[in-house]
Regions:
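A structural motif
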Residues: 1-185
Length: 185
């Protein structure tokens, strides 16, 4: 591996088998990066992390079952990564987290709202007070949010994030291309 701040490598390097969608990457409090991706056809979500900060990589390990897209990754106030994985069709949102920064992953639990179907993997970010915020879009086009009650503490219930609807695009659905929107004259 080249030294930090050094030049880029001259070519791409093989990083594993084919992925079913774009991967996601995040750093944790140990200084290591973790990459998450889904297998072809969404057969499962997998993660691969650096063995040591700025070093080589451990093997791919299963992160969750069937997945619509690579899990969303966010670091919490304690420096531990949290992963949010949505099943195809959006009926189940799973949540897993590192037990310690750079450490093993907790088996996790279901994280979604009963009876609410989501259209895409949510987004998550840490605020200035150390609370993690998760945002998701429902199949009705409504944005929902769930926030930690305090840094690294329990979660508050899901709530509406405003009353404006957005245009939901189901995960895995083809996006509208520019040539489909505009006809040449």
């Amino acid at each position: 591996m080249p030294p930090p701040g050094g030049p880029w490598t001259a070519s791409w390097h093989r990083f594993g088998t084919a992925a079913g969608a774009a991967p996601r990457v995040a750093g944790d409090g140990s200084g290591r990066l973790t990459v998450a991706a889904i297998g072809p056809s969404g057969v499962g979500a997998f993660a691969r992390r650096q063995a040591v900060p700025s070093g080589g990589w451990d093997a791919w390990v299963p992160l969750s079952g069937w997945s619509a897209a690579a899990p969303a990754l966010a670091v919490n106030a304690g420096g531990r990564l949290e992963a949010f994985t949505l099943t195809p069709g959006g009926a189940r949102l799973d949540h897993r987290w590192q037990i310690t920064p750079g450490g093993e992953t907790h088996p996790g639990a279901e994280f979604g709202e009963p009876g609410i179907r989501l259209v895409a993997t949510p987004a998550a970010a840490l605020d200035a007070t150390g609370r993690l915020h998760v945002f998701a879009v429902t199949d009705a086009g409504r944005v929902r949010t769930r926030v930690r009650a305090r840094p690294s503490g329990g979660w508050q219930p899901w709530t509406a994030f405003g009353d404006r609807a957005v245009a939901p695009l189901l995960s895995g659905s083809p996006a509208l291309r520019a040539e489909d929107r505009f006809s040449p004259r």
